[in-house]
Amino acid sequence: MSIYTNILTKQGLYSIIKAREVNDMNKEQTDLFLEDILEFGKQYVATGAQVKRVEDSMINLCKIYGFEDAEIYAITTLIIATIKNKDGEHFTQSVRVTKSGTDLGRLEEINEVYKYICSAKPDLEELDRIIKHPKKTKPKPFFKLIGYMLAAGSFAIFFGGNLRDGLAAAVVGIFIYLMDYHFRLKKINNIVYTLTASFFAGALAIISTYFGLGENIDKIMIGDIMLFIPGLLLVNSVQEMFNKDIVAGLYKLIEALFTATAIAGGYALSMILLGGMLK
């Protein structure tokens, strides 16, 4: 149980209305507060959260600190925020979101921080600290590797493969994990990464069948393809458009379509270049 959960347990979650009060921040403090709110939103968007949820959370945080008039506009790559202080002055800042993906663990941590801020309403110094220097759970590469292997092997068997196909898909899953880890560190373009990784995954599946590790090349490929499928991204894009966030929804939809095209292109290229090994 983290420090935020402990505080929530002791104090309870106060309502936002009760926490509102006229803010007494000066200009420099208001600029810092807005900077912190934008950083919070940036971290939120980077986890794959819906932009509607991000906007609502940021507006609520502004109201908690006395900024009743707050306008937030967020898309997958940009957040713009405007607030008005007690003297009627408007403050506007924006932040570019360069990182994107799906990280449910980090999303849960951010939700916990959000609840803590709503409950305790920390001073500006503490707010700046907990947002800009968050406590992150250490990644566990071994468990992630096991997840890749289990997912690839299980899907290969689920779609009609035998145990040998599942084992071959799991072995290829190890290489997919290693490629994913390496390319993510290099911050390579996601479409280029998907195309490259799909090609090598397809090539490894063909090689595994050629040497007798696997039996049905199509089942092995299907199992490994499932590691690349942008299913959550596609679902979120449709949900964003239903929430009338057309720009954010279209951005995610186009990204999902390009990713799917890269997957198909990578596997097709491996079949064209190495397909002769199957004869």
Language model feature labels by segment:
Residues A46, K63-F67, K115-S119, R184, ...:
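Generic secondary-structure signature for well-ordered alpha-helical cores
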Residues H133, I176-K187, V235-A248:
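C-terminal ends of transmembrane helices
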Residues T137-F211:
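Core alpha-helical transmembrane segments of integral membrane proteins
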Residues K99-D165, E255-A264, G275:
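Alpha-helical transmembrane segments and their cytosolic membrane-interface
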Residues M1-P122:
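Soluble N-terminal domains of membrane-associated systems
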Residues Y210-K279:
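Generic detector of multi-pass transmembrane helix bundles and their immediately adjacent loops
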